[in-house]
Amino acid sequence: MRLKDCHGFSDFRELARRRLPSPIFNYIDGAADDETTYDRNTKSFEECDLIPNVLRGVENIDMSVTIMGQKLDMPIYCSPTALQRVFHHSGEHAVAAAADKFGTMFGVSSLGTVSLTEVREQYNGPQCYQFYFHKDRGLNQVMLENAKAAGVDVMMLTVDTITGGNRERDLRTGFSIPFKLSLNGIFQFGIKPMWALNYLTHKKFSLPQLDDFVDMSDGTISIGKYFSDMLDPCMNWGDVAKMVDFWDGQFCLKGIMSVEDAKKAVEIGCTGIVISNHGGRQLDGSRSSFDQLSEIVDAVGDQIDVIMDSGIQRGSHVLKALSLGAKAVGGGRFYLYALAAAGQPGVERALELMRLEIERDMRLMGASSISDLSRDNLRFR
């Protein structure tokens, strides 16, 4: 199986599975507890049907959107994700270059494997920064100042990770960062030689945003340990309000799931919220983002940019979310599988296929622009 054989989400997933060591593939692929919310995130779209209009003259399609002051040529962006150079040695550089090519936003995580400055200097597209709030308030301040100095366009504070989700696949496989050379790790290197060769012969793994603060003296740290030991469960609305004031720019909360929290985000001056359950990786049993979208849009959609992620696999999923009132959607696994499968060419192919799906489906819906989409286009079963 090669990149040219990938025509959709499941194909990229399969190619990534073939190329990655099992612990790394399952880190991307897995979720919390029984993975019920993870499964529901995509299945929820199946409970909603599209109602197309015809004879609307749809030769020219404009799928551009503007979110938090950023003009995007397509209504889906590459959500910031951690540890990208573990999945492919080109990591964030591949994702940023591909997003730049397609005129959409990309993000760097606090657990990113390149520095904010390095990415900002090389790519001109809209950039967001996924910020994790740490117990060390000095670290938080340094990270905010570094992001501002790097010219980050959107600060995206993740608010649903005050402790780590119970990701049982990671516990079973022993996933850690950097990839641990245990007996099982050596075995995984051996059965995936090309991944191993690339991992060992390219730039040494690091976490530039955290290198001066994370103790990796024993060589590794588990994701669960990072969340439980370093992130601050005491984070509250007062802390976030201070961050919003300091940032004094586009500020987004990622991980909002309740109307009450959405209203509070408006009150403290946020310019965007991402309706997200972290791809099902945190609280299993929580509602799907798509199911929760409409009531949050109804409550605050005229006061703040409402975005959603979690479960997006198809262009039709994007259109359903936009029809409900989302301004745009974010995707993680949809490009991570492609990154793992083939680096930058993989991410470009994933974005191109998604763009074509959105364009095709807009024509079939009789919509020339995103503004033509509305709830009149939807029926729930």
Language model features by range: what are they?
Residues 77-83, 126-132, 224-226:
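Short, basic, glycine/proline-bearing loop/turn elements
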Residues 1-69, 178-235, 371-373, 379:
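An N-cap/entry alpha-helix motif that binds or orients negatively charged groups
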Residues 1-46, 288-309, 313-381:
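Alpha/beta catalytic cores of nucleotide-metabolism and tRNA/nucleoside-modifying enzymes
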Residues 83, 97, 118, 122, ...:
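Alpha/beta enzyme core
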Residues 49, 64-66, 75-79, 105-107, ...:
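Short, conserved beta-strand segments within well-ordered enzyme catalytic domains
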Residues 72-111, 116:
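Glycine-rich active-site/cofactor-binding loop and its immediate structural neighborhood
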Residues 32-33, 110-114, 135, 257, ...:
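Short beta->alpha linker loops
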Residues 101-122, 126-140:
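A gly/proline- and charged-residue-enriched helix-loop-helix capping module
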